[in-house]
């Protein structure tokens, strides 16, 4: 058990028959009445976000999440196959389950598979990935307006905005948390 006064961003807790990750929290001490903790939680099974208020000092159960380093191998129809780097066991996850992560997954990529009591509840990608541009309009010499962008499609099929100087075949560093262009590799 952990006190809500000890909340930290990224902490996983078990509340209301769900596994939740603390996204944001705020200790509130009103002039009248007792203090409380207002928190924003993400359900790790469904991805739903919920705001919940706890009384100060209230105890909640901390969920022990197991992280395993795995390597993405290949897509098999609607399923995606990952291999545990230590035991070489293979795990299949459906495309519905992966959702946003599919934009960045490529063969041999290392990811963290999160599980709770034997049930897989999440895939954590590296903070950045390097992907090759497969399709974009050519950059025109002299086209140097400040902050101008164009769209580019990378090898996974994901489309993002990039600066005008990026060409087909370039390898880009992409932020996986918001899908934005960082630099050329």
Swiss-Prot record:
Pathway(s) it belongs to: Protein biosynthesis; polypeptide chain elongation
Source organism superkingdom: Bacteria
Subcellular location: Cytoplasm
GO molecular function: translation elongation factor activity
GO cellular component labels: cytoplasm
Keyword terms: Cytoplasm, Elongation factor, Protein biosynthesis
GO BP, one annotated term: peptide biosynthetic process
PANTHER family per UniProt: ELONGATION FACTOR P, ELONGATION FACTOR P (EF-P) FAMILY PROTEIN
Family, similarity comment: Belongs to the elongation factor P family.
Protein name (Swiss-Prot/TrEMBL): Elongation factor P
